[in-house]
């Protein structure tokens, strides 16, 4: 069999507080009338900077790493250099290691009053399983240590946001992070039972988040399965750990916290057969809801939720699904 390894590379250069420059980055997917040959998709990347001191910054550099598979459009860079406004004095495109190219823009000045914005196109020439986030850094040529870095990525919900790949198997990472996001209003015990019993739902677990392993573009939530409420394809997960994989863009929305318990269910299509058991994708068909512990259940604001969970659990374990 094929050995599947998931590498957990942490983003080392976290966004540090920027003291000398204000920096923002905006990425949008665009449709060009005449895209260059071989381009599968095009984005516009706009970086805006302002100097935070009370004078303009003199010669400054904007250093842009490209998202995997993307290359900058030189025509749009030439226009920035040669236009009436002459936004940049020159640029350099460097092909980096492992196909992460970088683009260096030289600016004669960065104003301390107005933002200086540079906007150019980048084309996707080859598709990768997962587009890695990239970064934009601005610094003064003479004091390169005082730099400001921001990470950027294709916009939420973009088809380019792409897929989670392990080896040669890819799955879409939906922009819908988990199921309850699509429900408005109060969620009752009956609703939960009906949804957990819907066709396609494979398993229902109570699980504890024991470890979070972040990587460049997705998070691996290591969960210990406390209780199998409804048995699924994964034959004997109780008291064992399982990996639940989610797109990094969903981290805030999921807001999962270590050592908390969760009610989880998901569909068969989100199970991933691996040599040592199954991994699970967290996506728009995954229910992921905080399950308060005994102490938290005694707090008044959690009592209804805890009662609901007992009802759901008893119903599914004792009565089972109606279908």
From Swiss-Prot:
Location relative to the cell: Secreted
Q: Does the keyword Secreted apply?
A: yes
Q: Which SUPFAM superfamilies match?
A: Alpha-macroglobulin receptor domain, TIMP-like
Quick check: keyword Iron-sulfur in the entry?
Answer: no
**Which controlled-vocabulary keywords does the entry list?**
Complement alternate pathway, Complement pathway, Disulfide bond, Immunity, Inflammatory response, Innate immunity, Secreted
InterPro entries per record = A-macroglobulin_rcpt-bd, A-macroglobulin_rcpt-bd_sf, A2M/Complement_sys, Netrin_domain, Netrin_module_non-TIMP, NTR_complement_C3, TIMP-like_OB-fold
- One cellular component term from this protein's GO annotations in UniProt: extracellular region
Any single GO BP term: complement activation, alternative pathway
Question: Which Cys residues form disulphide pairs?
Answer: 177-250, 197-321
What are the NTR domain coordinates in residue numbering?
177-321
Q: What is this protein called?
A: Complement C3
For this protein's source organism, the top of the classification is: Eukaryota, Metazoa, Chordata, Craniata, Vertebrata
Question: What gene is it encoded by?
Answer: c3
